[in-house]
UniProtKB/Swiss-Prot annotation:
Alphabetized InterPro entries for the sequence: NAD-cap_RNA_hydrolase_NudC, NudC-like_C, NUDIX_hydrolase-like_dom_sf, NUDIX_hydrolase_CS, NUDIX_hydrolase_dom, RNA_Hydrolase_NudC, Znr_NADH_PPase
Name assigned to this protein: NAD-capped RNA hydrolase NudC
Family: Belongs to the Nudix hydrolase family. NudC subfamily.
Pfam families assigned: NUDIX (PF00293), Zn_ribbon_NUD (PF09297)
Gene behind this protein: nudC
Binding site for substrate: 25, 69, 111, 124, 192-199, 241
Binding annotation for Zn(2+): 98, 101, 116, 119
Enzyme class: hydrolase
Reaction(s) catalysed (UniProt annotation): a 5'-end NAD(+)-phospho-ribonucleoside in mRNA + H2O = a 5'-end phospho-adenosine-phospho-ribonucleoside in mRNA + beta-nicotinamide D-ribonucleotide + 2 H(+); NAD(+) + H2O = beta-nicotinamide D-ribonucleotide + AMP + 2 H(+); NADH + H2O = reduced beta-nicotinamide D-ribonucleotide + AMP + 2 H(+)
Cofactor(s) named in the record: Mg(2+); Mn(2+); Zn(2+)
Example GO biological process: NADH metabolic process
Cofactor note: Divalent metal cations. Mg(2+) or Mn(2+). Binds 1 zinc ion per subunit.
Species for this entry: Escherichia coli (strain SMS-3-5 / SECEC)
MF GO annotations: magnesium ion binding; manganese ion binding; NAD+ diphosphatase activity; NADH pyrophosphatase activity; RNA NAD-cap (NMN-forming) hydrolase activity; zinc ion binding
SUPFAM superfamilies: Nudix
Amino acid sequence: MDRIIEKLDHGWWVVSHEQKLWLPKGELPYGEAANFDLVGQRALQIGEWQGEPVWLVQQQRRHDMGSVRQVIDLDVGLFQLAGRGVQLAEFYRSHKYCGYCGHEMYPSKTEWAMLCSHCRERYYPQIAPCIIVAIRRDDSILLAQHTRHRNGVHTVLAGFVEVGETLEQAVAREVMEESGIKVKNLRYVTSQPWPFPQSLMTAFMAEYDSGEIVIDPKELLEANWYRYDDLPLLPPPGTVARRLIEDTVAMCRAEYE
């Protein structure tokens, strides 16, 4: 339940509007509310980090509004809370009116939801399930440069799960669509909430089965097999993509060194 911010309130401040985050000096604000001109605003506590509250404030600032990507180097737990705040702020902003009857809605006091007092419909934040998979062939890993990555970063394959599809089917389909190959021996590794804009990444490792690389030019600039000790520029630490790549490299080292 949200409340009015008081002078001595302190903690981490996720000030967000339209999927942007307020980052004075390029950092997530931490300290007393008075130091950031937040007294009198409404805030919702969305978690705790190292014993300190993390607050969401739905507000646009004139300056220093940026992407949550800018704080990706934070500790994973704090980054995830910042992402939670950005997603919740957008959820509340985009669900002011009921999609069924058009009446104004109000936030629940017991959970992250919006309620319609007219037709009693209940809305929750949208979460888009995605798969991400590291594919190994002997001492090499399949890495691709995506069209959205113009900085030379190479990463593993990923994509959204479609309606009526299992996670395993999504892996097989996405890999075939983007690279033209088949995989086998799929193994679940971990998951990571990813606020771009509201994804839940479900991470797998797989082995190459058959086929030659034929990329989808709408998705990829290039894709290739890279030996574990000769890799291109990789995603930053803390991302699930980097975790998958490092796990694959560790497996290759154990087998080939």
